[in-house]
């Protein structure tokens, strides 16, 4: 197959190779969907974005949770989010150890929360620790928004069970979203 026959490609290689592979494809005239995380560093991400602009190609990060039916069903329910509690826990496996747990797992929840809260960030507090690898394996982030909304996110790849839940509160309402089961439970008063 020649590049002229390929209009788009999915880049699903180890993160350390994302920039090299995506750059070569874009220079060959191919749009790219890149599995998350986009790259291993901000400098590489900037270079990838610049390459896309220079070659006039589309480079899209594969933040697939935004297309999860539960996330899509929840978006219209959000009126005045006040507090989020998000847990994404995974049993340890040797995959994706080239990046920390924030870029491997939490990035999905950051993407979703930022799409749910229509307010600039005021403060970010974070802590993370390497437990079973030389990268951060467990992390907690607290996002505070100008609107007063707060989001607490925990991601871990050191767990005995898989948990992928987002819970949030707004006036007279509690909403629980399970990414894995793709369901939403709404409690209203």
Which role fits each region the language model picked out?
Residues 16, 39-96:
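A contiguous active-site-proximal alpha/beta segment in oxidoreductase catalytic domains
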Residues 34, 59-61, 177:
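Hydrophobic residues in well-ordered beta-strands that form the structural core
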Residues 1-49:
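Beta-loop-alpha module in the N-terminal Rossmann-like domain of NAD(P)-dependent dehydrogenases
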Residues 62-69, 92-123:
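Mid-domain beta-loop-alpha active-site segment that forms a flexible
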Residues 110-183:
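Contiguous beta-strand/loop segments that form the cofactor/metal-binding neighborhood of enzyme cores
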Residues 28-30, 55-58, 149:
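A short helix->loop->beta-strand "cap" motif at the edges of active sites that frequently abuts
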